[in-house]
Amino acid sequence: MGSLSSLAAAAVFLSLLAVGHCAAADFNATDADADFAGNGVDFNSSDAAVYWGPWTKARATWYGQPNGAGPDDNGGACGFKHTNQYPFMSMTSCGNQPLFKDGKGCGSCYKIRCTKDQSCSGRSETVIITDMNYYPVAPFHFDLSGTAFGRLAKPGLNDKLRHSGIIDIEFTRVPCEFPGLKIGFHVEEYSNPVYFAVLVEYEDGDGDVVQVDLMESKTAHGPPTGRWTPMRESWGSIWRLDTNHRLQAPFSIRIRNESGKTLVANNVIPANWRPNTFYRSFVQYS
């Protein structure tokens, strides 16, 4: 059975390679370093998310279709799907390492604004990290969807701002809000009795997940085992469990966010679960 698990993990890795990633941008690295000297903000320095901190300098680019959600498949390296629909509504962004955090920044929310370009409105907009871009454009780099980039413009100047290519912006982290939604779990393709992979999404507050654990049941209709098994981050916001035995559902799933807050979705994955299926919980961060 171990071979099934290995093949599934390999398939997931290949699917990551197929994901449409953010595009490279032309820039002057020396100018970027000079412009951002003294920024003095390290978003990896704390174990807890900090909201509404000082506005911090960054640079923004955009990719995909002018009015799109970024990748042509409306996905991204975080594993989120249908980012052109509610609650993402195409207001998405790739993040560089301090924002994407090797996947642990997936789902986090930021207010961004631009003021220097003549086409900028100066109005702040909220974007969600759904993808990665590690091109060294700036210490903090948002590679926005065409939709999000255009929303920073004055009325009627969306295309003109997009033609600027690279712009200076400011950003601050904010709590995510997904009205009407509970935390969701999408069982990924290739999951099987010895390999279980799940996408976690729609977390209010931090928006991200730093640890996921799974609890099996004793039988299909029996009580839970009472034992939590840590899952491993597969990529983005997808977590997996490889085992040497057949997993017994229903599964309860425990998640912990960046601020250390824990939630448990009891029996959220039913005994008759199927791959490529979404299961909504009854829990949400307050």
UniProtKB/Swiss-Prot annotation:
GO terms for biological process: plant-type cell wall loosening; sexual reproduction. SUPFAM superfamilies: Barwin-like endoglucanases, PHL pollen allergen. Disulfide bonds join C78-C106, C109-C176, C114-C120. It is a peripheral membrane protein. Transmembrane segments: none annotated. Expressed in internodes. The gene is EXPB4. Residues 194-281 form the Expansin-like CBD domain. InterPro entries: Expan_Lol_pI, Expansin/allergen_DPBB_dom, Expansin_CBD, Expansin_CBD_sf, LolPI, RlpA-like_DPBB, RlpA-like_sf. Belongs to the expansin family. Expansin B subfamily. GO terms for cellular component: extracellular region; membrane. The lineage of its organism: Eukaryota, Viridiplantae, Streptophyta, Embryophyta, Tracheophyta. Pfam families: DPBB_1, Expansin_C. Residues 1-24 form the signal peptide. Induction: By gibberellin (GA3) and wounding. Residues 75-181 form the Expansin-like EG45 domain. The keyword Secreted applies. May cause loosening and extension of plant cell walls by disrupting non-covalent bonding between cellulose microfibrils and matrix glucans. No enzymatic activity has been found. May be required for rapid internodal elongation in deepwater rice during submergence. This is Expansin-B4. The keyword Glycoprotein applies. Glycans are attached at N28, N44, N257. Keywords: Cell wall, Cell wall biogenesis/degradation, Disulfide bond, Glycoprotein, Membrane, Secreted, Signal. It is found in: Secreted, Cell wall; Membrane. It comes from Oryza sativa subsp. japonica (Rice).
